[in-house]
């Protein structure tokens, strides 16, 4: 296994936020409505983790370091873990495990449907993130995993619908998402300079001038 310490560092870093939030809820440090705070925190964490996952390929192209790609699958699975926690908190604290209330919630808050579609997409990606699925699906595997772009759009729409009174934070995440998607356009991706290559070229130029 390549980069074991890097993988471990990413794993521990991804554990910090959920453990901290659950601990805060345990000691009643999340205010009068801890359930709502947990739902919001895990929802936002899912979006942030999705953006971080999508950033791995551009970072690899920019730096030439393969370690970014090595942890991409792990980050994607953490994204799924966060969304599972998000939905678990919603079921526990918002629905109170009253599934009959879900129909009422869907009518009152249709953005839940958008979030549920994003969850199903992440579920499909998580289930097929293994080598067996890659071999089994062949060329269809890449097509399926391009669903991540649709999931990002659904996640941003879900957030937009919730926070439309104050769009500053949403605009930040939407802007980052747009940049990450643009960096995957082949014509743009080919123009991404490698920092290592640029530094090496600069060094050679200095030596030649010297």
Curated annotation (Swiss-Prot):
Topology class, membrane: Multi-pass membrane protein
Gene Ontology CC: plasma membrane
One GO BP: protein repair
Cofactor requirement: FMN; heme b
Disulfide bonds: none
Record's cofactor remark: Binds 1 FMN per subunit.
Pfam families in the record: Ferric_reduct (PF01794)
Subcellular location(s) per record: Cell inner membrane
Keyword field: Cell inner membrane, Cell membrane, Electron transport, Flavoprotein, FMN, Heme, Iron, Membrane, Metal-binding, Transmembrane, Transmembrane helix, Transport
Transmembrane segments: 8-28, 37-57, 75-95, 110-130, 147-167, 169-189
The protein's name in its UniProt record: Protein-methionine-sulfoxide reductase heme-binding subunit MsrQ
Encoding gene (name): msrQ
